[in-house]
A protein has these predicted regions:
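Catalytic cores of DNA base-excision repair glycosylases
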Residues: 1-179, 183-196, 263
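Intrinsically disordered, low-complexity, charged terminal extensions of DNA damage-control enzymes
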Residues: 1, 5, 168-341
Length: 341
């Protein structure tokens, strides 16, 4: 992996943040592009947030990107531009928690500190046949202690990386390859035939399905985009204006747009898009809402902006809106002026 070409704590920090809730094959191109653009903590500390978000576009969990900028600023301002090598100092950096601190300390500095991610939780729960809910904090603490007890002196970096790889490639969630596992003879769950039942986890909550209206508002030349609040789902990213829609409380799109100062001439259905997050599913119905620039009352500010269709590519949009962005870029230039429609 490119982040393991050396023991640079900055590269390890970036990679570990990117790998949170994200597959390795997805992260690879993003990591290469990110490091090419921001090769040092100083470069990241001086970055424009929107540029970083654009580079992160499609990777998801966008708070990670904002925390990286905040973290880089803290490293530059409080640690003279050097990634600290103590657990307490690392955990004072935004976005760095128990696992990431352990990964940086063990991999970059070869310190005997456990780095317990989902893969390691699974491996250790099976190795010792831990028949407890591994999502509980006290159980995670127990597993951290078990990992600490088996880290070989002077080999924390290679051991922790090997443990992660073991979980990713051999001790997998549904089909563990016990016959080629180096711990085949001593794995308690294999001996007791529990490897397919462990680790124990609290069942996930069902995904909530939400219907949304997405308004692609076009004045004959430009399209209106909205910047989401910095905190919360898809924070700080751009979108087309939208809202939740319930069958039992219909409100016309025309009246809804009037609330933000948009008077529409025509409302035309365009595309249907479904996007699933970890805990949420959006069923989105898109509508082209045609207005006239001369009667638009909405003012540009930090939340709203009028842009040309071809400029949409320059803004960081979440994957959920990609199909709407592509539709707008490909279709809107073909429309003349709303009065001609």
């Amino acid at each position: 992996m490119p982040w393991r070409d050396n023991q640079d704590p900055y590269r390890i920090w970036i990679s570990e943040i990117m790998l949170q809730q994200t597959r390795v094959e997805t992260v690879l191109p993003y990591f290469i592009n990110f490091i090419s653009r921001y090769a040092s903590v100083q470069a990241l500390a001086g970055a424009n947030e929107q540029d970083v978000m654009k580079l992160w576009e499609g990777l998801g969990y966008y708070a990670r990107a904002r925390n990286l900028i905040r973290g880089a600023l803290r490293v530059v301002e409080h640690f003279k531009g050097k990634i600290p090598c103590t657990y307490k100092e690392l955990c004072s950096i935004p976005g760095i928690g128990d696992y990431t601190a352990g990964a940086i300390l063990s991999i970059a500095f070869n310190m005997p500190v456990p780095a317990v991610d989902g893969n390691v939780l699974r491996v250790i729960a099976r190795l010792y046949a831990v028949e407890k809910d591994v999502t509980k904090l006290n159980v995670k603490s127990e597993i951290r202690a078990l990992v600490s007890s088996i880290i070989p002196d002077g080999h924390a970096s290679s051991f922790n990386q090997g443990l992660m790889e073991l979980g990713a490639m051999i001790c997998t969630p549904k089909s563990p390859k016990c016959n080629i596992c180096p711990w085949y003879l001593i794995c308690v769950s294999r001996i007791l035939n529990l490897q397919y039942r462990l680790p124990l986890k609290t069942p996930k909550k069902p995904v909530q399905v939400v219907r949304r209206i997405i308004a692609v508002i076009f004045d004959g030349q430009r399209v209106l985009v909205h910047k989401r609040p910095s905190k919360g789902l898809l924070g700080g990213l751009w979108e087309f204006p939208g809202w939740e829609f319930a069958e039992d409380q219909k409100q016309s799109i025309t009246n809804k747009l009037l609330q933000i100062g948009i008077i529409t001439h025509k409302v035309l259905p365009i595309i249907e898009v479904q996007h699933t997050f970890t805990h949420l599913c959006w069923n989105m119905s898109g509508f082209l809402c045609i207005t006239d620039a001369s009667i638009v009352k909405v003012e540009e500010n930090h939340e709203y902006r009028w842009v040309l269709p071809e400029e949409l590519h320059d803004l960081p949009f979440p994957v959920a809106f990609k199909q709407f962005v592509l539709w707008a870029i490909e279709s809107l230039p073909g429309f003349i002026h709303p009065v001609d429609l």
